Amino acid sequence: MISLMRKCVLLVGVALLALAQSVPAQTGVTAVLPNGRAIHPAGNWIALAPYPFALAVRPDGAEIAAPSIGFPFALNVIANPADPQPSVRRMPAGENSDPAIEVHAGLAYSADGSLLYVATGDSGKIRTYKTSDWTKAAEVSLDGPIPNFSKPAEGSFAATVLASPDGKTLFALDQGNWRIVVLDAAKLERIAEISTGSYPFGLALSPDGARLYVTNTGLFEYTTIPGASEKNPLGTGLHFPPFGYPSKAAREGATVEDKKIPGLGDENSDRGSSLWTYDVRDREHPSATAKLRLGDKIVDASGGTVGGAAPTGVVASDDAVYVSLAHEDQVVRISADGKQVLTSADLSLFSGPRFQDPQGRPLRGVMPSGLALHAGRVYVAESGIDAVGVLDAASMQVVEHIPVGWNPSAVAFSPDGQTLYVVNTKGKGAGPNGGKQHDPNAPSYVGSLEMGSLSAIPLADLPSAAELAQTVLASNTAAIASRPALPHLKHCFLVIRENRTYDEVLGDVTGANGDPSLARFGLDGWAEEQKSATHLKVTPNLHALVAQFAMSDNFYVDSDVSADGHRWVMGINPTPFFNTAWTSGYGGRRKDSAGAAQPGRRALFGGADAPMPEDEPQFGSLWEHIAASGKGLLNYGEGLELEGNAELEGSQPEGQRLFLNSPLPKPVFESTDRRYPTFNLGIPDQFRFTEFERDFRIKLAAGKIPALIVIRLPNDHTADPRPGDGYPYRASYVADNDLALGKIVDFLSKTSIWKDSAFFVTEDDAQGGVDHIDAHRSILLIASPWVKPGTVSHDHTSMGSITRTIDELLGLGPMNLEDALAGEIGGIFDATPHLGPFRLQPSDTRVFNPAAARFAKPKTKKEAAALRDVDDAEEIQKEVEKSASTLRRPSSNN
């Protein structure tokens, strides 16, 4: 069972900024994470607001500032951070964002420490605060004219900021317009700009301030499809993505639906996955001096490299520059002029055949991020294994790995070099967000519960490198246990649904660890919109499937929301860039549009479920893993909701129209039923079942059923009630979903392939409900003739466990560290099959009558928006954080 976390301190606020409060720094913090791994962080633990991605140390070492993105957007200021009793300000103090506090993933102190420069993100400004009293001193917009430069920029997104060593110049990264704006620090005026490559992320200056470096973590610039207009989406948008990636069509363009779709260009050009170097000695006339492509070459061949290296962190010494490659688990040492890679360091601790993929390559998943230099060593945040790697800066040999918190993102040092500071984006997890032990007045939304942290680690107190490595290894392998061999099957089905916790659907299952008082979508459920709508059988089919087959009551999603969830469930660990994008987007501070003039506002803002080329791990996701095996796959609706789309009335059967030349992963492009809808809550899941059955029968008759079949059933996401369309309650969407699920298993269990199949059902995330164990606990059903009937697994499992089990059932090797280090879904499989079919359970027509269900016909813009938003974070947060009397079983049900 996941460990329950102690609540972090929330401070009382006054005026613009909160009062400081002394809080004991914790030591000996331990936790079990949703992915089943453990953390045993070194040093002192200081709680911060959720999702901190950066930090800055004041030059005198007396203070640290760290911005948090999302829930709320906050500025954390820690005074005396190396002391056992640091003083912490969190601004704002509560769980709600304050419009006056704008932050993103970068800030910097002035040379004398009297000012803090803060990049504000979506508003495109650099704002300064006086550190003496934390009042605003001044601000400057990155928008507007710059003398002797091109037309004034608009739509800037201020991502991070650096101060020159002499304190006279600021360099602000504009992710909207893909440029760096040079500012006079004293006057806070724009004086120059320089272009960057695709999706710039990290900035660093050489120690003498003569050179500036930027990492470009993207690959392409996505452009609007010619003739496409968001004013006439049905008539001008594409019905289906234009091409697969990588491919000749993606590079050069193609004619699709009578439209000439522009290509994306060379996936191996230096505009992306690169380090660009600039001469900034003349700050009014900076110039690019080197553009260096990093990482392995992307190839258009099954089983090869498909993802960019995702250059992320960057730091410079006098004679070299160091860059972390998030997708390749490396730090590279580059000549100071930025023109050549000198050497590289492989970071993974995991070696041997057990940690190799089917082609003998090392499993990726260390996910190196932020960097720091100190005393001839490079320190790198290893976001994927909850550690800080330490390298010898000259030889690039790994010296040690230091255990820290969940998802470390940035590292820095005290000026005296004695203390290492690390911000842990997800801290130690969320803990429960419902049930009798949860304070109904406390936050319930996962984004508000998942407090970040600062690890303050005195280097002199660290144990030996061997002991540190053993702690990191043991923590990351905590979920692995010896299990009996699984049967070898021919077909695995993966059904991906939306947003539900375990308790709100299956909390009423006897013999399992559930809270029936939270089971609003169970067999004795209720509709919150109407007090008399009680004793509803919302999910009779899921409950019947659980009784006949197997489930877990100790399964957790790795994700927080749908944006990262649809990546995690396909074996993609989101990059640091993506995590900063979705958190700012879900927090309501990242405006985007397919028709935006700014390339950085058209795509990669974390608002869609489909992986873009920039998301692709080096060797791909589960899609490429299966395709490389030659066993084949089929896709019904998953991974199609690309950036630059609109889900709207009249777009069926596909459910959307597309406005950007965004590609699909090639295996998805080649294996998708193009009549099956993607996410669109105006389309009943009954229609999805009908289309699945139609297409699948054809393939079944032809004997063309592949190894992996992925099915998206999204309507348990819920939306506003539509009584006229057959959805009188939010619970009606869940009941629609349940009936479609039952129909699919009823159909498949009577086919000839059932005896060779396993059927997995899970959610993309658990953000839409509450749970008495953990906000990440969710649903995992396994239906197969080969499971022990009625089994409830209590083993700790996660999304990687599903991938791992599919790998083993199909006779494949592991894909990456996410599945290799995940707990196996063991103890549920049997040596002999149980071949009885599943019998469909009828819906409770009080909550959902399939005969009345129809495509949505929204009458207002608000109704239309409710059907197309894959996640409206504000709406979900309000729903989840309703009073206990609403989310718990009504008194009439007790």
Regions found by a protein language model. Give the residues of each.
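Short, conserved, GDST-rich strand-edge loop motifs in beta-rich repeat architectures
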Residues: 67, 215-272, 425-449
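Surface-exposed loop and turn segments in beta-propeller and other repeat-based domains
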Residues: 44, 89-99, 138-153, 283-307, ...
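Blade/loop signatures of beta-propeller domains
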Residues: 23-41, 464-475
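Short loop/turn segments immediately following the C-termini of beta-strands
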Residues: 69-70, 121, 175, 217-219, ...
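N-terminal pro-sequences and low-complexity stem/linker regions of secreted or lumenal proteins
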Residues: 465-894
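Residue-level detector of Asp-centered blade-edge/turn motifs that repeat once per structural unit
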Residues: 59-60, 111-112, 165-166, 207-209, ...
